[in-house]
């Protein structure tokens, strides 16, 4: 599901109903837009709650405008529409990766990617935990909780992305700080435009 479709679905469920059809049209969201893959209400609702939590955490951290749109777009892509809080693979491929701090047997699986911006490896869990005052090294599964994942994503952004990006309209530069191989670059950029247009139309995100 593209971010445009996600935003349209939020409106149909009443979360953005007060904005009116004009605002949604200005955001580039067709009134008849439908997800490519219909999702059960409970599943979709969980996605919306995760997005709302992430959005609020980012606003509290001072993100606005293009930076906020880019942050949400990147998290949307990384977490498959705010619905996947851990990577599909088992993590066995990270076994023995000393560059990630995986020095003990089983560390690859234990510290596989989790969260909106998925952190991977014992060292990254330790750093995030120390920065946030959370026992992530001892309890890595906490990184899959939306409230914790939102804090981790903002921490990662503030420490790894923001200091290294001069222009948040540059999706390539932002993506390089999150996924150096630039996987899904076109999708990330389209979602960035969707969020940016929504902020303009609804006068939010500023």
List each model region and its residues.
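Surface-exposed patches in mature extracellular/periplasmic domains of secreted proteins
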Residues: 62-71, 84-88, 163-175
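N-terminal carbohydrate-binding/catalytic regions of secreted carbohydrate-active enzymes
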Residues: 51-54, 58
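Peptidoglycan-targeting cell-wall enzymes and recognition modules
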Residues: 36-48, 73-156
């Amino acid at each position: 599901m593209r971010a445009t479709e996600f935003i349209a679905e939020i409106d149909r469920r009443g979360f953005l109903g007060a904005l009116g059809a004009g605002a949604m049209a200005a955001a580039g969201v067709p009134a008849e837009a439908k997800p490519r893959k219909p999702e059960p209400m409970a599943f979709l609702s969980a996605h919306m709650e995760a997005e709302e939590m992430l959005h609020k955490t980012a606003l509290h951290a001072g993100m606005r405008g293009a930076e906020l749109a880019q942050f949400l777009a990147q998290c949307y892509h990384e977490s498959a529409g705010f619905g996947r809080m851990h990577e599909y693979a088992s993590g066995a491929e990270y076994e023995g990766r000393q560059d990630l701090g995986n020095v003990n047997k089983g560390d690859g699986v234990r510290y596989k990617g989790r969260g909106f911006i998925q952190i991977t490896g014992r060292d990254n869990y330790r750093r995030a935990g120390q920065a946030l005052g959370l026992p992530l090294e001892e309890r890595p599964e906490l990184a899959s909780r939306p409230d914790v994942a939102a804090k981790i994503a903002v921490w990662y952004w503030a420490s790894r992305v923001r200091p290294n990006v001069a222009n948040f309209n540059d999706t390539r530069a932002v993506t390089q700080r999150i996924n150096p191989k630039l996987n899904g670059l076109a999708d990330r950029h389209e979602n960035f435009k969707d969020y940016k247009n929504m902020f303009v139309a609804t006068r939010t995100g500023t």
